[in-house]
Amino acid sequence: MWDPDVYLAFADHRARPFYDLLSRVGAERARRVVDLGCGPGHLTKYLGRRWPDAVIEAMDSSPEMVAAAKERGIDAVTGDLRNWKPKPDTDVVVSNAALHWVPEHSDLLLRWAGQLAPGSWIGVQMPGNFESPSYAAVRALARREPYAKLLRDIPFRVGAVVQPPTHYANMLLDAGCKVDVWETTYLHQLTGEHPVLEWITGTALVPVRERLDDDAWEQFREELIPLLRDAYPPRADGTTIFPFRRVFIVAEVGSGRPAA
């Protein structure tokens, strides 16, 4: 279960990639703007400020996140973004830190590019840190007993969850889009006693928490702390540097030449 409060513990850090993504979306006006994977809606509200005349459509797979978004006044619905289809007046589609949960997201991007009208925009940001020490530590601990038998059904993501940026660039160029694709590694300066643990508790550890009872969950966290501390040692000033790679995809539909 996704916990909006835990997720928002690092809201400022998590928000920066969203704004970096939107800065490259060139739609001056929009009739309908869609946020797929809207989370608790704290960033969706910006879409209404950026395009004040647009209808804002929002969707998330988590009922808890949708409830939090509705509390912020967002007209959000619970649903699977794989089943979403654009309405004829959709001018901007945004998906921030959500599509990496969908193994077939490349197919989705191509489908959207084919369904949206020329001149529409797609903006996507996905984490690209699945080989990072934090994920490696979680996988290593999950292979140990007593956790292995409890967590063996979790498809811990490893390898090419998110493709290299050139994959998305070539794919969307071939589909006739004008593309702007890049990657950035943010060096987050975190504070607190166990900041990396608290960060991943709101994301990577969600499926682990769902399968462990309270006692096993607390034990798992306690055993994970030294692994994360070794991987991300705190500085003398008390801060912890947490590198986080992200991949950005911006495409203007029908503005390029499709491959022959």
Curated annotation (Swiss-Prot):
Keywords: Cytoplasm, Methyltransferase, S-adenosyl-L-methionine, Transferase. Its EC number is 2.1.1.144. Disulfide bonds: none annotated. It catalyses: trans-aconitate + S-adenosyl-L-methionine = (E)-3-(methoxycarbonyl)pent-2-enedioate + S-adenosyl-L-homocysteine. InterPro entries: SAM-dependent_MTases_sf, Trans-aconitate_MeTrfase, Trans_acon_MeTrfase_C. It is found in: Cytoplasm. GO terms for biological process: methylation. It is an enzyme of class 2 (transferase). Its main location: cytoplasm. GO terms for cellular component: cytoplasm. One of its GO terms (molecular function) is trans-aconitate 2-methyltransferase activity. Belongs to the methyltransferase superfamily. Tam family. Catalyzes the S-adenosylmethionine monomethyl esterification of trans-aconitate. This is Trans-aconitate 2-methyltransferase. It comes from Mycobacterium avium (strain 104). The lineage of its organism: Bacteria, Bacillati, Actinomycetota, Actinomycetes, Mycobacteriales.
